[in-house]
Amino acid sequence: MPQFFRTQPLTDRTTSHGFAEVSSEDHCYCVWLVPAISSDIELRYRTFVDWAVCHKVDFEEMQLPTAPHITLARGIKLKPNQSFKSVLQYIASKRKSPLNIKFGKVAIGDSFYKRVYIQVEKTPGLEELQNAAYDLADTSDPFNVIEHPYMPVIYAKSICSDYSTSDPIETISSIGQASWGKACFLELIQLNKANHQGYVCDRIEFTV
């Protein structure tokens, strides 16, 4: 079975080998790119978590990602009993270019999972991974379509405060100013659309 993780920051997630279950409209599979725990960006994210917890009242039903990550794709289609690792291995095999991860500005989105996020430049390496992921995805549902990879930092239904001031913007922007590091993980996540809970199905490691 996949490993359950709560919507709490910095949960220690371990690989759990498994296979796809019967598909359901209640959940979808996503692909994340996650830095190593020892990376500068992970350490910077911990500082951000402290800030975010103190500003929880500024957001409606705020949740935090379990770790800093770049969301590449949603709606990955798996066949019954297909191994999670085989999906990740296929996606990783299509990358021919360096990832060369570059962050842009802090932005406010129009959905729960993209309420506050950091823009990510679609470099050739990231585009290769994303295109490979969408080879396996159902793009008929607009929810699944992600045109540009991004790093979500706050999940929420809405923002209840003015976030045009410099303090929150500088605090959130500091995450994108950190180094991603040389190693990272490609993860397959099973997401429950109703309660926003998820499972780490499997992960593979590769160099940037």
Swiss-Prot record:
One annotated GO molecular function: 2',3'-cyclic-nucleotide 3'-phosphodiesterase activity
GO CC term (a single one): nucleus
A Pfam family it matches: CPDase
Species whose genome carries this gene: Schizosaccharomyces pombe (strain 972 / ATCC 24843) (Fission yeast)
Gene3D superfamilies: Cyclic phosphodiesterase
Descriptive protein name: Uncharacterized protein UNK4,15
GO BP field: cyclic nucleotide metabolic process
